[in-house]
């Protein structure tokens, strides 16, 4: 069903036991894939934000939700990363920056042939002072572990839940000559 936004596609639905097919014309559009499942106040001063993955819009979605909760009186936050399998490294760095002080190491990358690259907090995040609890489980992995690990390393918050997946690392795809890639 992929195609240019605004173009149309004709669908024919054949159903078992029904002679006449259903005919539909569907207009293609961009389907947003959001990272935030929920954000609301659970107590007068405590907000809750659930992130299901780290995508291109995660930092923007988080800031919007956090600003809304702060306007409602949020001083403390519960960040739910349970079941979050990770995603974009930059999104994890941007999120961790919201909680950490200037020049605090978030993560570093290093490979057999690549030099070490350190990623530090800028110290300009909007939630550097309130109490922070991060919820994790056995399905919390990769970028989620980078965020929770940085928060734990700098004693910025409390990590609550089950032992996470154990994949707090960065994978770099390798392009192959036939146009495919491996991780």
Regions found by a protein language model. Give the residues of each.
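Carbohydrate-binding/catalytic loop surfaces
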Residues: 183
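Cleft-lining beta-strand/loop regions that shape enzyme active-site pockets
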Residues: 1-180
